[in-house]
Amino acid sequence: MAWTALLLSLLAHFTGSVASYELTQPLSVSVALGQTARITCGGNNIGSKNVHWYQQKPGQAPVLVIYRDSNRPSGIPERFSGSNSGNTATLTISRAQAGDEADYYCQVWDSSTAH
């Protein structure tokens, strides 16, 4: 049976010395195959911080898909893109494929507070 929709879940993680920094995100995002998925990660003035995105499939280690807001590591398809401004960082997956179904983690790195 062909996949008709993907369920993308999101977990958030903050790295830095300010443990009280809070991130908000949808528990899941559903998208039809071939359509565009947008997964958000919200935080106060998150646009001033570095956001990294990871994809994790069951039984596998996380894979970095976007680093420092909008950069793709080698081997990651151009369908994956990122943006970060104001209070929201967004991971965009264009032309969604069945293989994109996974957990997606946003990691926020605040270099101004890290030691």
Curated annotation (Swiss-Prot):
Main location class: secreted
Residues spanning the signal sequence: 1-20
Region feature Complementarity-determining-3, mapped onto this chain: 107-115
Occurrences of domain Ig-like (ranges): 21-115
Subcellular location: Secreted; Cell membrane
Sorted UniProt keywords: Adaptive immunity, Cell membrane, Disulfide bond, Immunity, Immunoglobulin, Immunoglobulin domain, Membrane, Secreted, Signal
InterPro entries in the record: Ig-like_dom (IPR007110), Ig-like_dom_sf (IPR036179), Ig-like_fold (IPR013783), Ig_sub (IPR003599), Ig_V-set (IPR013106), IgV_Light_Chain (IPR050150)
Residues covered by region (Complementarity-determining-1): 42-50
Stretch list, region Framework-2: 51-67
Region (Framework-1): 20-41
Region annotation Complementarity-determining-2: where it falls in the sequence: 68-70
One GO biological process term: immune response
Cysteines paired by S-S bonds: C41-C106
A cellular component term, taken from the record's GO annotations: extracellular region
Entry keyword annotation includes Nucleotidyltransferase: no
Region (Framework-3): 71-106
Subunit structure: Immunoglobulins are composed of two identical heavy chains and two identical light chains; disulfide-linked.
Function: V region of the variable domain of immunoglobulin light chains that participates in the antigen recognition. Immunoglobulins, also known as antibodies, are membrane-bound or secreted glycoproteins produced by B lymphocytes. In the recognition phase of humoral immunity, the membrane-bound immunoglobulins serve as receptors which, upon binding of a specific antigen, trigger the clonal expansion and differentiation of B lymphocytes into immunoglobulins-secreting plasma cells.
Stated name of the protein: Immunoglobulin lambda variable 3-9
The species this protein was found in: Homo sapiens
Gene name as annotated: IGLV3-9
